[in-house]
A protein has these predicted regions:
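N-terminal leader/auxiliary helical segments
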Residues: 1-181
Length: 181
């Protein structure tokens, strides 16, 4: 989660393992944003929404992952999200915005709630309010609903490739960051 909240260069302000995870998160973002299946999925959106389709797709893919979690992970989703919330609660130093929302995130099970498509309405509305020009995502949820099946197929093709990439990168970054000497 740190990767969504820590911006700019990493200069030792976080523990080495956290900075390694942030760097991995950033490499995953680059991989995702440039992947042909991601580009194909974005092209499904109406022209007027295509510029912001990556945001909508990210939210939708989070929904797909939560809904189909058992297809991609051995650990049940409630156990995984519970561990995430415990780590956040025990962490004395979180990025400022994450520290503000972590208690509510845990209390309302934000990560697990993505299973429900209806939750995406609140998520998209919240993101839209934070954009420099609010209103750009209006109609985005209806478009996700309309494109549900083809985008789900895009996710099912893409996610195993993302898992493979992340596993390779984790192996590389552990060595690069000096964890396995």
């Amino acid at each position: 989660l740190y990767g969504d909240f820590v911006k700019g260069p990493l200069a030792g302000q976080w523990p080495a393992d956290i900075e390694a995870a942030i760097r991995l998160h950033r490499r995953i973002d680059v991989f995702t944003d440039s992947h042909p299946l991601q580009l194909q999925a974005r092209a499904r959106f109406a022209v007027e929404r295509r510029r912001y389709s990556g945001i909508l797709l990210d939210v939708f893919f989070d929904h797909c992952l939560a809904l189909h979690w058992a297809d991609y992970a051995a650990e049940p989703l409630p156990r995984f999200t519970g561990r995430v919330y415990q780590v956040l609660a025990a962490e004395p130093r979180l990025p400022e915005r994450l520290a503000l929302i972590a208690p509510r995130m845990a209390a309302q099970d934000w990560l697990g709630s993505y299973r429900e498509f209806a939750v995406l309405e609140q998520v998209v509305a919240g993101i839209d309010r934070r954009l420099s020009r609010p209103g750009l995502l209006i109609g985005g949820l209806a478009e996700l609903e309309r494109l549900y099946q083809p985008l789900l197929e895009d996710f099912r093709q893409f996610y195993p490739e993302l898992q493979d990439f992340a596993a390779r990168e984790r192996g590389l970054s552990l060595y690069q960051d000096g964890f396995h000497k």
